[in-house]
Curated annotation (Swiss-Prot):
It comes from Bacillus velezensis (strain DSM 23117 / BGSC 10A6 / LMG 26770 / FZB42). Transmembrane segments: none annotated. Coiled coil: none annotated. The lineage of its organism: Bacteria, Bacillati, Bacillota, Bacilli, Bacillales. InterPro entries: UPF0346, YozE_SAM-like, YozE_SAM-like_sf. This is UPF0346 protein RBAM_019500.
Length: 74
């Protein structure tokens, strides 16, 4: 199964137009991001405790929903 990070990288963009693209760009620059994880709670905890670049967890939740739909139910 594709990790959340690997999935998120498809949203990277040099000129991000939305919050998920900004999140993807920032996660790419975050060397501590749990790149192999597919666990919601692990990722959520990391972002809440260690990532100061995410303005709202709603962005993560939206990206997670897309990940769940496209990867887990594909």
């Amino acid at each position: 199964m594709k990790s959340f990070y690997h999935y998120l990288m498809k949203y990277r963009h040099p000129k991000p137009q939305d919050a998920i693209s900004q999140f993807a760009n920032q996660a790419y620059e975050d060397h501590g991001f749990p790149k192999t994880s597919s666990d919601y709670h692990e990722l959520s905890s990391y972002l809440e405790l260690s990532a100061d670049y995410l303005e709202t967890m709603a962005t993560f939740d939206e990206a997670w929903e897309k990940y769940e739909t496209e990867v887990h139910h594909a």
